[in-house]
Amino acid sequence: MRTRAPAVASLLVIASLGLSSCADLGGLDLESVGDEGKTTYIKLALNQAETHPSYIALENLSSRFEEATDGRWKIEVFPNEQLGSQQEVLQFVKSGAIEMAIVSGTQLENMNKDFQVLNMPTTFSSIDHQMTVIRDQDLMEPLFQSLAESDNISVIGGFTQGTRNLYTTDGAVVTPADLSGKKVRVQESAMHIRMIELMGGSATPLSYGEVYTAMQSGVLDGAENNEVSYVTQNHHEVAPFHSNTEHLVGLDYMVMRHDLLEAMEATDRELFLEEWDAAMTEHTDLWNTETEAAFERAEAAGVDFVQVDEQAFAEALAPIRDEFLTTDFQRNLFEAVRAADTGEEAP
């Protein structure tokens, strides 16, 4: 049986790394980061396993950036929630205890509701549409820098979460009525809670690392995620009914301490951003390959892939846009994102 250590374990890991949760910036001297003759270590938190495309792309980013800077910078990637849940590590970045993290959009929308524009059903039509938008600096900079002054967080870019679907432990879901009474794990987001409610289920926010055990024990009846996470986290073992709702193209964000980004020499910062852009491309390529492999693995394991009533779910979700896009900025950003959908492949 899989279990997740209590949150205090995350703090013990932080302590063992010589980090602090207060504003001493995790021991980094911003006046000397990246100096010749020394290595500046950046700790990057990830909630995925070592087999996940995000981990692979980040490890390769680390190697390239270390080589490009002659060893002056080294990114250390900590997978599997070793440094804490996404909610915890976002606070660690904010306080300076660690330097970077990959977090979901739901975490950022809890800090600034404008992020929910990129985190709602119907925003993106495809992964290519999504990645084209994320690379559009003119469009994204006001949002991505909105937490810099208040929370010391810069959003650097994002990794696709792919297309998200429902999966359940007992019985196929074809229409919203089939989800009635079922407890479905969602991320801690008011919009995602409402999304599952509109789709017919009972939304249950829960940490990602606890989902397997919760479904195994019957605390949950299902969850929603992409095929890669569905298989790499072995959720298909306990929830073998996969309904192709395709209700959302999700996004993970790379967040970084804003003061550290500003403290980097201009050439190092440019190198880092170039290598990050390459990491986004690599991640998307890996994602597409891994999605197909995950589908084949799940199918071989006996997963029941269910075609849903797409029209019924589309109608059920229709109210969410008017409910959550409540400001001119949000509505204008949504329309700009939709207008950027050219149907072409992302770089």
Give residue spans per PLM region.
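Short, glycine-/small-residue-rich phosphate/pyrophosphate-handling segment
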Residues: 151
